[in-house]
Amino acid sequence: MASQLRLHLAATPPLLPHRRPHLARPLCPTLNPIRAPLPPLSRVLSHARPARAVGGGIEPKEGVVAEGDESGGGPVLVGEDSAAFELKDQSVASWAYFAGILGAVLVALNVLWIDPSTGVGTKFLDAVASVSDSHEVVMLLLTIIFAVVHSGMASLRESGEKIVGERVYRVLFAGISLPLAVTTIVYFINHRYDGTQLWQVQGITGIHELLWFSSFISFFFLYPSTFNLLEVAAVDKPKLHMWETGIMRITRHPQMVGQVIWCLAHTLWIGNSVAVAASVGLISHHLFGAWNGDRRLLSRYGEAFEVLKKRTSVMPFAAIIDGRQKLPKDYHKEFFRLPYVAITMLTLGAYFAHPLMQASSYQLPW
């Protein structure tokens, strides 16, 4: 699992009343961290050849204007083109393999963790719940456990991959993180209305639509974690990517921003102490993840990341407003891509499937 924990499970979370019983050749290849200082940026920009991302690599493309050219334009990129997806570069065999792996993982997850008669998920949750009778405390503990495991394994990724390889480490990472994420999500769904009510806004006209729209938008920030699904499933060799286009121009840490938007919207809607506890845990985890992510990218990409960092921002739109980020004239085209279309359709579909998702969650004694 490459993404951070999200209580949406690839869906816009419910805002319903409770019913419960090309781009430039990168200055640093993805797989080869920079070990020597880069030449001055002005020199790089004057000699760099514009390029476009194709699949997992980069190939030259004419006609893209680099900074310093007579016709003007945005700076040559040091990172990768996010959400680049071309059908001609896809392998049917790879996606069939991905589907098979996904099916096997879901079956194993159900048998070994979710099913109370065969899995250990219920015993794990009982052990955590034995610490306190407070749903708020248990909710916070679950997010902390997930955060420690998820961020800890991400931090150890470089060392771990040297020992067991990229694919094996990704399988271990997902195999440990996914059950913990599912447990936290199900517990939140089952107990989100069990806390102390702090405010009530569900009857206010227009609040549902406002918060639903906020949750929907949050997924365009959260999505970069799955730009490379074949790598998530270890079909392709996993890499530590340094994205630079699309949503990354708005904020360098879209997952953190998306999670904050999601948490604020749902905490306002639910309005109780359990929602507050979940949001505190998740936002804290993602704030640490933003710092840790910068640290890992700096370690892997060196000066190239420093260049990217100077022209991006953590706070949404800050780099654009103060002029450090120069949006290309056709910036909107960076969103008119199949991955963004797919996430839009899946998010809408999952939202309308929330009654089924809730019913499945309520069947578990979690």
Curated annotation (Swiss-Prot):
UniProt main location, coarse: plastid
InterPro entries, per the entry: NnrU_dom (IPR009915)
GO molecular function annotations of the record: 9,15,9'-tri-cis-zeta-carotene isomerase activity
Transmembrane spans: 94-114, 136-156, 171-191, 203-223, 260-280, 338-358
Broad EC category: isomerase
Listed GO CC annotations: chloroplast membrane
Key words, A-Z: Chloroplast, Isomerase, Membrane, Plastid, Transit peptide, Transmembrane, Transmembrane helix
Topology relative to the membrane: Multi-pass membrane protein
Localisation per UniProt entry: Plastid, Chloroplast membrane
Transit peptide (first-last residue): 1-45
The keyword DNA damage is annotated on this UniProt entry: no
One Pfam family of this chain: NnrU
Catalytic activity as recorded in UniProt: 9,9',15-tri-cis-zeta-carotene = 9,9'-di-cis-zeta-carotene
EC number per UniProt: 5.2.1.12
Any one GO biological process: carotene biosynthetic process
Role summary: Isomerase involved in the biosynthesis of carotenoids. Catalyzes the cis- to trans-conversion of the 15-cis-bond in 9,15,9'-tri-cis-zeta-carotene.
Protein name per its UniProtKB record: 15-cis-zeta-carotene isomerase, chloroplastic
